[in-house]
Amino acid sequence: MSNKKRSKNENDESTSLPLENSELLIEYIHNLKSCLNVYRREIQEKNKYISIIKNDLSFHECILTNVNVVWSVFNNDLLNLLCNNEQKEEGEEIIKQRNIGDEINEYNNLTKLQNDENIKNNNMIKEDLEDDANQNILMKSPYYNIENFLQVFLKYINKKKKKVKVKVKDEGKKEKIEDKKYEQDDEEENEEEEEEEEEEEGEEENKEDEEFFKTFVSFNLYHNNNEKNISYDKNLVKQENDNKDEARGNDNMCGNYDIHNERGEMLDKGKSYSGDEKINTSDNAKSCSGDEKVITSDNGKSYDYVKNESEEQEEKENMLNNKKRSLECNPNEAKKICFSLEEKIGTVQSVKLKEYNELSKENIEKNKHDDNNICNYLSHNEGENVIEREDKLFNKLNNKNYRNEEEKKKNQINFDYLKKKIKNNQDVFEETIQKCFLINLKKTLNLINKIMYLKNVEFRKYNLDYIRKINYEKCFYYKNYIDIKKKISELQKDNESLKIQVDRLEKKKATLIYKLNNDNIRKHILDNNIKDYQNGIDNSKVSYFDEGENPYNRNNKNYRTDNKNSDDNNNNNNYYYNNYNSDDNYNSEDNEYNNGNYRFRNNYKKDSLNEDDVKKNPLKVCHKINSDSNIFVNFENIITKQNIIHSEPFRNLLKESNELYITLKEKEKENIILKNEILKMENKKDEEYEHLLNNTIEDKKELTRSIKELEINMMTCNMEKDKISNKVNTLEYEINVLKNIDKNQTMQLQQKENDILKMKLYIEKLKLSEKNLKDKIILLENEKDKMLSGIHIKDNSFNEESKSEEGKIQLRDIQNDNDEKYDDEKKRFKELFIENQKLKEELNKKRNVEEELHSLRKNYNIINEEIEEITKEFEKKQEQVDEMILQIKNKELELLDKFNNKMNKAYVEEKLKELKNTYEEKMKHINNIYKKHDDFVNIYLNLFFQARKNAILSDSQREEQMNLFIKLKDKYDIIFQKKIELTDILKNVYDCNKKLIGHCQDLEKENSTLQNKLSNEIKNSKMLSKNLSKNSDDHLLIEENNELRRRLICSVCMENFRNYIIIKCGHIYCNNCIFNNLKTRNRKCPQCKVPFDKKDLQKIFLD
């Protein structure tokens, strides 16, 4: 919370919150607790990340320390070899100048000094081993365990040398039997000492065998040996003190050879020389193996040194066989150790199994070479085992007091002989050690190169920006590919639907073309109609009235036949009307019209004329002709099919239908062109789609190689993105929640202030009402007292004047009025008292609510303060985390700088230059590979970007094609809509034709009715003809009536009376005919062809 909010809360301490919002506060508190839990989880996650980073740092430190340890050991070993060679060269020059006696004295002095120095070195070793840093360095070297190699190498040699010691002891016993005369007193003491030594050596041999077996069973040998070295150094101090006492008591010609490691580790007398040891000798500078003591005696005999050659050869062969048998199994066990160490490397560095197999093969070959070197070395060191026997004899003879000058001379000769042997053996030993260490250097270089390669690979994997770019581009390209597929599928569906519609339209088109262009069918129909008319004319010649037949029935028969013909003609003419096309058919129509008129007339002649009647009654015939002619004149204007065909509206309809047919043909051509274009576009799209598919397949093959390597990084990036997004979302949600909380709190405070002000005003009003009520109560009580006092006075006065009854009545009335007033005032008082109690209860409740709200406000302030403290702590922890990350980065940089400085130091000796050159060549080769890989990556990126550009271009082209296709589709839709409109117009034309046909049928029915009327009128005329003489005047009246009726009937339909007049021309027609012309938009007068509108019409009333 800010200071402003605190100041508001402090100023508003008097205000109180209602109980309704307490639930909201509880919810807010719950939300704050959840937020705190979220912050704690985030802090835990950050601590986890920090621990992971620390582990990575420790791993890199381990690598650096291992490399430093290995290189320091090998450098020290090589320096030791160089120093030994220099000392040898100096020693050879000194030997020529000095005598043997001086050498022995100087050697004894050196041994004393070396013993003192060894004690000091042992103390230093203890201090170093106590340090944790040195222990960690030694514990963290799994790549090449030098001390393990050293122990195994020494134990091979020690076992075989102990066998030789046993043989030397047996020979010593034989010599003691020969010298019993001279050594009776000393022999007993020596036997006891020898027995003790045998027991100790037997125990040591068993222990060493067990340890040697454990070296090949357990892989944690190195760590166990480091723990043993501490206890081992303590025992060394005791042994050295004992050696000092023995050196003081014994005047040896050649003292003990003391061997110490350059790193400060002392070696037992039971251990032999390895590569990292210094050999301190006398001024002769001759070096021995680690457990050998070169001792000569004055009393020694020459036969101890000069033996038969056959015995020496047998002993050599036996030793070699035993040593070879012991080493047959050891190489495989040593190889197992190497494999186990390499597997440890693989677990740390996550190297593949294939690499391990390759390493194992190389190590097998190298170990074979090492084993052969060791065997050669042991074969050369057989002479040293012979010297051990002579050493022990020499120790025994030193304890004796008798020494002769002759024996001294022999010892001097033998000493020179031994020196020569030691030189030869030592040269071979140094060569084997050099070979061993060169092999070990190659191993370490291979491991270092692999470590460097692994670092480069990991650096590439953790290049997150590069991975994000590739993932983004891949997702973008894949989304576009899916969108294109969806669009293509949708277009295919639309294309199929359009094909179906096109097929339907083609079918309709075929039907329309068949109906519109088939003129032969129309001509055939016309020819059939003409033949029918001719047959009708031929049949009209037949007599109309036969004997025994009623003329009425005959007329009906003719009427039925005519109706049948008319129905047939209607069926043919329906097709004819719909398919009528050109103006060339008007001649045939005129012929049909004339034939129709001719038929009509002949039909009426059938009814009227007959040859027999002419012969019999010529007067009647004349009368019939006149009457028929009059009737024909009356019905000439009857509407027939021919009149309809020749009418102008029908011709206009035909013209419009021709125009529509022409437009349809044009639009069909356009549709065909558009279809061809659509097919071309589809073919192009299919080709492009196939091309794109081929490109994508090729790109996939190239991308899968890189995607397999990048999938792991994608997962890591996605996990990081999800975590970051979740964090951002949580923070945004928390910010929004806090903002909403602030807003709600401010709104609540404002509402509460308003409510409190209202409550204060209401309380003041209640207080005023209380005061007024109290005043009223006091006044009422005073009035009551006055009334009671007046009543008592009146009672007394009325008692005195009780005689008068009128006064009593008045008193009673007054008392009743007073009682009523008193009761009313009591009721009011009670009501006011109840209201006061209610108001007091409400005030108490409000006070309690205010107290509760005050407590809640305090709690809320406390919670806000806790939240502020938590946020501050969270910010501090974030700062600490950032500082830790910076420190870790700085440490990484420092370690890398140290590593680079150590690797870039110049090597001291010329022999390592060759190794440096090989290493530089390998690094160059690795850098070239790395450059090639980078070039390949750049090429791949360029290809990927080119493919992406091609995809974008293809997308743009496809979009353009889609736009063209959409435009063509819109045009096609417009044409299709026009076609639909034309079909609607044709339907309307067909409907109009149907209506006209129905109308024609109605007219035919009316004709039939008129024919019936005519037949009746003919009958009447016949009757009238008989009475012509009598009723000639009536005939004239009938004729006049018919003429007048003809004038009143409409000249178009010949059915209805004339109702409407056209003002422009003055012609009169019926209602139906005029409005039919208006509906068909033929707004012209049928007779004079003058145009008119509805405004030009006017109704006429003849009645």
Curated annotation (Swiss-Prot):
Gene3D superfamilies: Zinc/RING finger domain, C3HC4 (zinc finger) (3.30.40.10)
Composition skew (Basic and acidic residues), residue ranges: 271-280
Gene Ontology terms: biological process: proteasome-mediated ubiquitin-dependent protein catabolic process
Xref: Pfam families: zf-C3HC4
Main subcellular localisation: host cell
Localization annotation: Host cell membrane
Bilayer disposition of the protein: Peripheral membrane protein
Ranges annotated as biased composition (Acidic residues): 184-210
Ranges of biased composition (kind: Low complexity): 568-585
A GO cellular component annotation in the UniProt record: membrane
Residues making up the signal peptide according to the UniProt record: none
Protein name in the entry: Trophozoite exported protein 1
Organism annotation: Plasmodium falciparum (isolate 3D7)
Name of the gene this protein is made from: TEX1
